[in-house]
């Protein structure tokens, strides 16, 4: 588990960016696979989620995960939230309720954890390229502001994800972003006639543009096997038929 230096300063919250070590799964899911949507044994995944919850002192019954759909849809979880077996469809969660853990799972996409140190509100965002393109980050931050947040009180941490050097994209991908945002050109690099995209840096840029200055980026490339993270792109390259998911969690104590 990786802890953010910035978020670790606050005793009111618990959080963690988890790698693939320390779980119960085997084979291509070895070992802390937290992807309920993967083809791994459900029993193993549920045991892995219990391990994660224990690490951040949370009841596994109080962990909320989404059926992530690469959207800009988010949910505000209030004290009346009823825990159901069926997960909500979306890609970000927000709450001000104590002891409710918000989690997102990734396998190269960018996990973002946000804390309002004044209002004691937390958010967990799954920021894949589609969600970023659909402005999920902007929508979450604007919602927080609507709830009374001031951007000077927001702490945002970008967790481990695929880095630019490993994220090759096609021309139509680049064109799509350039058409929407001319500034995105600074996040594309050409090397040996191949185009690469710095998704995590682009997320950082978006958060900064929205007025958040208290930012941290955890520079761990999920694609690089030595960093011990699950990676969708690496699994596809290795011709594996599925892949595990890394989880990132935040909770108000």
PLM features: residue spans?
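Active-site microenvironment for binding and transforming phosphate-containing groups
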Residues: 1-253
């Amino acid at each position: 588990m990786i802890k953010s230096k910035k978020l670790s300063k606050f005793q009111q919250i618990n959080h963690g960016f988890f790698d693939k070590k320390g779980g119960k799964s085997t084979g291509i899911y070895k070992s802390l696979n937290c992807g309920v949507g993967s083809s791994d044994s459900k029993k193993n995944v549920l045991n892995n989620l219990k391990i994660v919850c224990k690490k951040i002192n949370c009841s596994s019954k109080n962990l909320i995960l989404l059926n992530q759909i690469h959207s800009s849809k988010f949910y505000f979880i209030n004290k009346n939230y009823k825990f159901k077996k069926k997960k909500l469809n979306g890609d970000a969660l927000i709450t001000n309720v104590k002891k409710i853990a918000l989690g997102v799972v990734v396998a190269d996409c960018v996990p973002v954890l946000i804390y309002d140190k004044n209002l004691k509100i937390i958010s967990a965002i799954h920021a894949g390229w589609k969600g970023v393109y659909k402005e999920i980050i902007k929508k979450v931050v604007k919602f927080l502001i609507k709830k009374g947040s001031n951007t000077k009180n927001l702490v945002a941490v970008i967790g481990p994800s695929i880095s630019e050097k490993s994220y090759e994209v096609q021309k139509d991908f680049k064109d799509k972003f350039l058409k929407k945002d001319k500034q995105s050109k600074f996040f594309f690099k050409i090397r040996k006639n191949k185009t690469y995209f710095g998704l995590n840096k682009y997320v950082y840029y978006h958060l900064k543009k929205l007025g958040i200055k208290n930012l941290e980026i955890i520079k761990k490339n999920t694609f690089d096997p030595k960093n011990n993270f699950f990676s969708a792109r690496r699994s596809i390259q290795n011709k594996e038929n599925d892949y595990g998911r890394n989880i990132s969690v935040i909770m108000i104590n």
